[in-house]
Regions:
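Short beta->alpha connector loops at strand-helix junctions that form conserved
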Residues: 28-29, 69-70, 86-97, 172
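Phosphate-binding beta-alpha-beta segment of Rossmann-like dinucleotide-binding domains, i.e.
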Residues: 86, 92-144
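NAD(P)-binding Rossmann-fold cofactor-contacting core
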Residues: 163-179
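Glycine-rich Rossmann-fold phosphate-binding loop(s) that bind the pyrophosphate
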Residues: 8, 150-151
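N-terminal glycine-/charge-rich "phosphate-binding" loop or analogous flexible N-terminal tail
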Residues: 1-43
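Rossmann-like adenosine-cofactor binding region
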Residues: 41, 52-58, 174-264
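N-terminal Rossmann-fold NAD(P) dinucleotide-binding loop
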Residues: 154-155
């Protein structure tokens, strides 16, 4: 079996040598769209995080299996792969703790104003007339936390939010989730929460879900966190309203990645941006590779 990794750089410094047990392994750190076909045309198994595998590539290669090194599968033409008899696997559940942790890191930064206090302590505290310096910050206890997308990550965030004393409500993007532990509400009610966190996939129901028609419902001093996909929140509409309304946002995902230089969110004051790293704790990446290996091993041995 010939295995080809197309974008190993996206996995960081994780050891991939275990895959040598399954056959000949070729590792590319990055792959441009124009390079994909040449690199995989004679491969049996392709491993990709974000490199696109489309109809043309499938028609002109010998691939038998595509292992997506992520949960989202938007980069592969799944319907055509099925027609061609190509097995496609993803990895689910590996990043739940990592994404939940960054969600709370962003929320707690806004709630506790850590960046402000760090700067003050380093530059002004020594000249203070009293032992402290106070600007308003708030507790999570008693706040309403609205979740958009109550999948594995959404449920984990809900559990942790409850530990902080939050009242958790959620909006089902599929319309099918009826979790009995938390109150299911309409989107407009979620957007009136003190904290709103997005954990849903990008699909026809969630694309442009938050836009100028409903972002105005977010209250002053509330917090919007997007850990789902960039296209769920209209970035232009958010940029136009967030500072005027006086709420805050934390985004780990963007409509175009890497983020473009003209992305309107780059000019927003009340926002924290991270480069799509919520999934990528060391432990999560190690788990990802182990689960991907098990998928490929099973395919090879069948």
């Amino acid at each position: 079996m010939k295995l080809v990794f197309l974008d190993a750089l996206t996995l960081g410094d994780i050891d991939l040598s275990i895959f040598k047990n399954l056959g000949e392994v070729k590792i590319y750190q990055t792959t441009k769209p124009t390079e994909t076909l040449e690199r995989i045309k004679n491969a049996d198994i392709v491993l990709t995080n974000k490199v696109v595998i489309d109809k043309e590539i499938m028609d002109n290669s010998t691939i038998k299996m595509i292992q997506i090194l992520a949960t989202g599968m938007n980069n592969v033409d799944l319907e055509y792969a099925k027609q061609k008899g190509i097995i496609v696997k993803n990895v689910a559940g590996y990043s739940t703790e990592s994404v939940a942790q960054l969600t709370f890191a962003m929320v707690l930064e806004f709630m506790n104003k850590l960046r402000y206090y760090d700067e003050y302590a380093k530059t002004k505290y020594s000249g203070s007339e009293i032992f402290t310096h106070i600007v308003d910050f708030s507790e999570l206890n008693g706040k309403t936390w609205g979740i958009i997308g109550l999948g594995n990550i959404g449920k984990r965030v809900a559990e942790i939010a409850e530990c902080f004393g939050c009242n958790v409500i959620y909006y089902s993007t599929s319309g099918k989730n009826n979790n009995s532990k938390y109150k299911r509400v309409e989107l407009d009610e979620v957007l009136k929460s003190d904290i709103i966190s997005v954990h849903s996939p990008l699909n026809e129901k969630t694309n442009n879900l938050l836009n100028k028609n409903n972002l105005h419902l977010i209250k002053k001093d509330s917090i919007l966190i997007n850990m789902g996909r960039g296209g769920i929140v209209n970035e232009k509409d958010l940029a136009e309203i967030i500072d005027k309304k006086g709420f805050f946002a934390g985004f780990d995902v963007f409509t175009s990645e890497p983020i473009k230089k003209d992305n309107p969110l780059l000019k927003v004051k009340n926002i924290i941006l991270t480069p799509h790293i919520a999934w990528a704790s060391k432990e999560a990446r190690e788990k990802l590779i182990q689960l991907a290996y098990e998928n490929v091993e099973k395919f090879v041995n069948e």
